[in-house]
From Swiss-Prot:
Subcellular location: Cellular thylakoid membrane
Propeptide position ranges: 1-8
Pfam family, any one: PSI_PSAK
The encoding gene: psaK
Protein name: Photosystem I reaction center subunit PsaK
Organism (species): Trichormus variabilis (strain ATCC 29413 / PCC 7937)
Length: 86
């Protein structure tokens, strides 16, 4: 009984496309920009190998901003898929 209810609620799978990749990249850029403005200690240890390339971020700040960017991106992509845009 529970299995049939779960199968009835399942949506169609989302196919990857370049549009989805672009949305994820834009979401990560927005998150990194937001993190650059709001993180109190962006250059906390451990440092990254090329600090200038990563905008002066340490490993914790880079991981935090990209994780936040992926959460934003997934929310945008799944929200648009739920609305029928993809």
């Amino acid at each position: 009984m529970l299995t049939s209810t779960l199968l009835a609620a399942a949506t169609t799978p989302l196919e990857w496309s370049p549009t989805i990749g672009i949305i994820m990249v834009i979401a990560n850029v927005i998150a990194i920009t937001f993190g650059r403005q709001t993180i109190k200690y962006p250059s906390a240890e451990p440092a990254l190998p090329s600090a200038k390339f990563f905008g002066g971020f340490g490993a914790p700040a880079l991981l935090a901003t990209t994780a936040f960017g992926h959460i934003l991106g997934v929310g945008i992509i799944l929200g648009l898929h739920n609305l029928g845009r993809f």
